[in-house]
């Protein structure tokens, strides 16, 4: 009896110690991350999802997360996690609209046609339930595995799904259906090229006023620490050419390729040049009511961070003010930083950002396997 009591006691003490250690570790992480006065950072999910990438949510606070592995996930607002799928190929892109969930893989897009029904089945099931889904569209195959993930976003006003098809190479003249952004009609499934000359966009969003598509683009590697700039662009007309591989940034010539550009091609310059190699992924216009008024419609940028620069840059979330009438960008500022340590090591890499139902923002971190929540408390 005495031994049983001692065993139970030591198990309890061990459990308390582990919980305390996890809590302390989480507090150390969030205290390291710096945000403007009045904002707070918390870990929303910690090491429970492998390589979280794309993130979306419904009006009830349910969250849907893609990944750089083979899994896609559903998370309740109470932070209980369920599996949507287990065997997809790099399902980094995911978006919810009108009770449907669209999920990308490297060569397909899937659709879950009744999300509420699948949510109920997941919650009621006592076993590992995977959701019923269908193939929505086939995508061009990527044979190199470079830039093979497909970011997606629903254009609800035009009833279209927007999809990136990145270049299979660091820099090379691409075939017609590569280094482009596509649109797919949600009803007819008709495809149309939205933009040419986009090396690899892993983030786009629709301006809340104009509904025009703004997107990030990652510049090529191998030209040095400070060129080419990464980019923020805006699409004003379909089928415009944004330069890759012939020009970059505000139409700076990419020597070795510029002379090979198709004759009479008009290149659209970026509206903002980000520092080279910060690797902008998800971008998001804030649409909530929790942040101060000056943040409404502000563009948030998830800078994933450099990997081949002598001094690392990025690893943070930045913001830009976008004028929807003039299509200009200004006031580039750091909003959240701290993932990059003084010794140049890092413990997190931001990927994708959304406004959550309560007015906070959530962002994914595929390096630390975490979801973070940033909210505002009045000072």
From Swiss-Prot:
TM segment ranges: 9-26
Keyword Electron transport: no
Coiled-coil regions listed: none
Alphabetic keyword roster: Membrane, Transmembrane, Transmembrane helix
Presence of the UniProt keyword Heme in the record: no
Family annotation (InterPro entries): 6-blade_b-propeller_TolB-like, Glc/Sorbosone_DH, Quinoprot_gluc/sorb_DH_b-prop
Disulfide bridge partners, by residue number: none
Domain of life, per lineage: Bacteria
Main location (coarse class): membrane
Location in the cell: Membrane
CC annotations in GO: membrane
Gene3D superfamilies: TolB, C-terminal domain
Any matching Pfam family: GSDH
Membrane-protein topology: Single-pass membrane protein
Family membership noted in the UniProt record: To A.liquefaciens L-sorbosone dehydrogenase.
Protein name as annotated: Uncharacterized protein BB_0024
Taxonomic lineage from the root: Bacteria, Pseudomonadati, Spirochaetota, Spirochaetia, Spirochaetales
